[in-house]
Amino acid sequence: MITLHFCEYNRFNQDYDTIFRPGGSGDYLFLLLKTPMKIYLQDELIITKENACLLFTPQTPQHYQAVKRFCNSYLHFSSDLSPARQYGFPENEIFYPSNPAEIDSFIRSIQMEYFSLAEYRDEYIHCLISQMFISISRDLLHRADRKEDGENLYLLFQNLRLKMLSNCQEEWTIERLCQEVNLEKSQFYVYYH
């Protein structure tokens, strides 16, 4: 079960603020960094863009500083299972989800529930965090699929281009082009444009 220790949605600290926990925080820390940050990971300085995510494991050193403005949403929690292993996304590594607004919305809902006195609060928080992690995992998996599809299409279009250049005398109608790459007209226009 995931147990939430603390969370904050849309948290602003002072400009250039630094977080430095050399021994980690003793729990998992999930960050949605809404502004660029300087992060030190395994003795390497990385400057993030906005909407970077990071899942720190419990004993991993946490050292990050705002490039200027400091804004993030975050969760401190413990879990019986490693969320990264369970849901297949990176830990102690920066990644950029394509759905940062959705993640932020989850964190907002989690914080609202955290401060409520409603029945089954802890169970509901567990479900919300699990749902957020599933959403992140699906996003990263589908992005990998889309990248692979894009690479395959690129090769198909490169081969088609070579075929057209090698056979300039032939008539190359849109129907034939679609047939060569096995796409419908509408799909062809989307990818070719």
Feature names for model-found ranges:
Residues 17-19, 89-93, 114-118, 146, ...:
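A short, mixed-charge helix-start or loop-turn motif at secondary-structure junctions
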Residues 86-108:
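Aromatic/histidine-rich interaction motifs
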Residues 2-93, 122:
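N-terminal regulatory/effector-sensing and dimerization cores
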Residues 73-80, 100-148, 152-166, 189:
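An amphipathic alpha-helical interaction segment
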Residues 170-193:
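Basic/polar phosphate-binding segments, predominantly the helix-turn-helix DNA-binding elements
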Residues 1-4, 23-28, 106, 125, ...:
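Short acidic/polar alpha-helix capping motifs at helix-coil junctions
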Residues 41, 93, 115, 167, ...:
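Short, flexible active-site loop motifs that bind/organize anionic cofactors or intermediates
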